[in-house]
Amino acid sequence: MPVQQRCTVVEMTPINPTTYWMVLEVGNMVEELGLRAGQFLHVACGEANLLRRPISVALAYPDEPEDTAALIFEVKGEGTRWLARRQVGDTVDVLGPLGNGFAVENGGRYLLVGGGIGTPPLLGYAEAFRQNAVAVLGFRSADRVILEERYREACKEVYLCTDDGSAGRHGFVDAQVRDILEKDKNFTAILACGPRPMLKSVAAGAAEFGVPCQ
């Protein structure tokens, strides 16, 4: 059952000119409500706190004195611009946890496929499964790449793709996914998060090779 509460900002760091890493103290959402990576929180944005924005959870930890959750968001309008101006010690109105996240099993081996701002929700799974995780990360261009170092520290292998070829492989992630599955399809599942066209292409490739996809 989602709860509404005021959460304190304990970290706010720009990742690039339009993307921010924000860590909140979230009460007992992790330990008692099961908040985890891949879910999201509805954060009220604006002085009147009238507009809520769904922000994906990249990491969630039981902690003291309160559980913590790392959220990553892009500045796209007035609401997220307001959110980016929050400072450590400020509080924001949060509703959550919401969404289902991914169904995973201990000891599983996973192919993580993230596109753009769909990359953060998979970070918790990369850090949980580490050498049992392979990641394919796709972005529009080199200046939009986020979290690459975190994924490289965690995963056995990381493949980077950009639409314009300015970093990593030139093209979309689905081509890289197919190349991986042609050589090795021994994955428990593919976990994918990103734009709808990307998800459809990745799901089609997964079906072709008989690998479950979420």
Show where each model-derived region lies.
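Ferredoxin-reductase
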Residues: P2-V88
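FNR/FR-type flavoprotein reductase catalytic core
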Residues: E78-Q214
